[in-house]
């Protein structure tokens, strides 16, 4: 799916990547449903593909789906990528209710990764979606990594309510502010997802979501 809307936030991170000024932690903050998690994952894929240097990459965030980096991330097997999200309450029923929080155990599981060097390039990327879901102990454990970031590691932290985060976490991150999508952006997303929908149907869906 194409990245639509919030181009200024996209460009801020892209510029940091081009200029070699990539801070170790980025807080991707804004209302729910505006593409923050999708952008974090697209950015992680692009960062790792660029660092690996094995693919011919066009400008923008796109990475060829046949690239090794894309295949490994899709399979959950990339050694330099981790994603922390709320897990199912019952591991045997992954399609049912999710746990209330991202646990401290999930955060601590990163330590084994940080004890080794990245495998495919000098870079690794951690996505947390959403950091608002961290248990208090998990937030404190993460803070230690943000204060003393492992070499080559980039944290992309999605937040729907950054004001509720520990001030010490916010202070160690560069902010990428995402805004609510306007009707034109919503229409573009709906056309991407529903290519057979008419203009009238798209307009009705936008109206229903107001």
Q: What are these regions, as identified by a protein language model?
A:
Residues 1-137:
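Clamp-loader machinery-focused feature within the broader ASCE/P-loop NTPase space
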Residues 4-7, 88-210:
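Non-catalytic interfacial helical region
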